[in-house]
Amino acid sequence: MYILFEGIDTCGKSTQMELLTQKHPGIITTHEPGGTAFGQQAREILLSDSLRSKRAELLLFLADRAEHYEEVVEPNHDKIVVSDRGFVSGIGYALANGDFDFDELVALNRFALKDHFPDRIILFMTDMETLKQRISEKELDGIELRGLEYLLRVQEHMKESILKLGIPHLFIDATDSIENIHQSILTYLKV
């Protein structure tokens, strides 16, 4: 089973992945970008926000996604693989950047993922107040420097994309307690 934990920065995905693997050590965890050797190099470029072209940024994310799928997800198709981010983030950020068509983005991601979208998606949804508080506690990367409104637009595009695609999903209130969120995830995944 291939599962995505999706959401904007500081929404609690990584914390929940840690809790899930503590409870179920057999689960394979990974992340995009950066879940492969190539992905780590791509991640450095992407987080530096040094690319002027949003198309180049999109293509680098897609190259990472294709490599990640082939190197991590596909060989473990008989196991539970949980990725901190994936194609939904890619579509959400691309739509927030403007000048991209949803159907085109879906087609490009289908190609990168060999036509294998995740079996389930968990989207962590936050609000302006929580985002502002959590962002203030960390050093910002190039993408986070685009602003809070930008990040919340990305989040809305993620939600809309999941609904349009009809992939089984759970929307989580990321402002809830860590324990309540964890319990909701366990119940949804039935693990």
Swiss-Prot record:
GO molecular function: ATP binding; dTMP kinase activity
Family: Belongs to the thymidylate kinase family.
Protein name: Thymidylate kinase
InterPro entries: P-loop_NTPase (IPR027417), Thymidylate_kin-like_dom (IPR039430), Thymidylate_kinase (IPR018094)
Main function: Phosphorylation of dTMP to form dTDP in both de novo and salvage pathways of dTTP synthesis.
Reaction equations catalysed: dTMP + ATP = dTDP + ADP
PANTHER family on file: THYMIDYLATE KINASE (PTHR10344), UMP-CMP KINASE 2, MITOCHONDRIAL (PTHR10344:SF4)
Residues that coordinate or bind ATP: G7, I8, D9, T10, C11, G12, K13, S14
Organism, as annotated: Sulfurovum sp. (strain NBC37-1)
Lineage of origin: Bacteria, Pseudomonadati, Campylobacterota, Epsilonproteobacteria, Campylobacterales
Listed HAMAP family: Thymidylate_kinase
GO biological process terms, semicolon-separated: dTDP biosynthetic process; dTTP biosynthetic process; dUDP biosynthetic process
GO cellular component, one term: cytosol
Enzyme Commission code(s) on record: 2.7.4.9
Entry superkingdom: Bacteria
Keywords: ATP-binding, Kinase, Nucleotide biosynthesis, Nucleotide-binding, Transferase
